[in-house]
């Protein structure tokens, strides 16, 4: 029988992370410079505010949303911040190398930082499926692979399907969900006997998770409109996202009560379902012509989210062996697909209204983009899962899953950590 004491990452993590950080610093030194153009001051302030909203969503929103586990709340918040900081640095370089490098050095603007923050958000969504089962050294690998895969996916979609920044980034919901679930499928499945309660939620951590959901709820309109260039499209995106998430809150709380035999509300369902409308309208938020359509979509998304959170995890756990703790991954996979379908429907209606006869071609392109995003997510996720299983990363023992004591110093608690 193997030892249940946690494997130390003292040799692995500092060497791996600091060497990588030194390499990133050298790359920034040799290949980047700031934008020297004189931007309009008003536009500069507005651009910074959007970037600030995205950072709040990532650091506070998603950080606290994943902190509901009874004994893994500290690690959830801190590891999310670690991944965000590393992911933004690598995403800035990667996007620059893929799009600007042939012309010389990579020019860093507020827009490129905004784009990098959104790319790093993909990792924070995916990691919900594996948090508690991996250490920081493994998460560094996951950040590098996922940001690289998403960056290349966006470049391929942009070049082949001729899409703008908003459209190729809005595949992030589907991509992140399937990437995270495929990584989780590769990791050891069940918790050892006697430790099954470790992945359960507790009252105080659940309150922190609700705080994260509130931050995401407030700033989701900024996320869906961040990359749109047209002022009219940005306005439509903000309005439609706001109406959709407002309705999904009402639906989430009501649907959660309906799903319980005694009419009680589940904290776990509400945490993710209140965001359902924002995910569902993400791809088509700038195309929806009327608020009532966004509200209907928010209602449907809220119901799907509650139903999916109740029934889908148990089904997937039995069939695929994916742990039931990744409710956000299940929801984003369903709601991302719903959003893509709504976008295709609206695109067809818009094409018919404009008298354009290439409806089939437009639908084929949209299906091709979605299929490519899912395939790359699954393939890169499986590759990441295989890499994370290598012994070099000193993965925590299964008996120490979902345990802050493996990673944090608590002088007043038991020895042996």
Curated annotation (Swiss-Prot):
Coiled coil: none annotated. Changing residue 282 to D: May be associated with low RHD expression, resulting in a weak D phenotype. The chain crosses the membrane at residues 12-32, 44-64, 77-97, 107-127, 130-150, 167-187, 203-223, 238-258, 287-307, 334-354, 358-378. One of its GO terms (cellular component) is plasma membrane. Palmitoylated. Changing residue 233 to Q: Found in RhDVa(FK), RhDVa(TO), RhDVa(TT) and RhDYo. Changing residue 110 to P: In Tar antigen. Changing residue 201 to R: May be associated with low RHD expression, resulting in a weak D phenotype. Changing residue 283 to I: May be associated with moderate decrease in RHD expression, resulting in DHMi phenotype. Keywords: Blood group antigen, Cell membrane, Lipoprotein, Membrane, Palmitate, Transmembrane, Transmembrane helix. The keyword Transmembrane applies. Pfam families: Ammonium_transp (PF00909). Changing residue 270 to G: May be associated with low RHD expression, resulting in a weak D phenotype. Changing residue 277 to E: May be associated with low RHD expression, resulting in a weak D phenotype. InterPro entries: Ammonium/urea_transptr, NH4_transpt_AmtB-like_dom, RhesusRHD. It is found in: Cell membrane. May be part of an oligomeric complex which is likely to have a transport or channel function in the erythrocyte membrane. This is Blood group Rh(D) polypeptide.
